[in-house]
Amino acid sequence: MEPFFIEIYPDKDDERKTISHQGEEFILVLKGELMVVYGRETYYLKAGETIYYNSIVPHYVGAHGDDPAQLLAVTYTP
């Protein structure tokens, strides 16, 4: 498992691309708001909220709104 501190800036709508890869991801939002597209679902997370998912499913993670988001991400790759 690898932990990361990440600051994400908002993307333009046409720059939002989903990715998929082996492994699992856990995200804790520290500041701001985050948009997570996971398969066909979209989740909006605020500071203090978390999400955990299998990263083989196509996903996108980006800041929601006009301000950057700060997060702690922990990834596992077999």
Regions found by a protein language model. Give the residues of each.
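Ligand-binding loop in jelly-roll beta-barrel domains
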Residues: K46-A47, S55-P78
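Conserved short histidine dyad/triad with adjacent acidic residue
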Residues: E2-H21, E41-T42, S55-P58
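Generic protein-terminus/edge-of-domain signal
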Residues: P10-D13, K17-G23, P68-Q70, T75-P78
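A generic structural signal for short beta-strands and their flanking turns/coil linkers
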Residues: E2-F4, E25, G32, V57, ...
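Short, conserved beta-strand element in jelly-roll/cupin
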Residues: E7-Y9, I19-V36
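Short, surface-exposed secondary-structure edge patches
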Residues: F26, R40-Y44
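Flexible loop/N-cap segments at domain edges
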Residues: I27-V29, E49, Y53
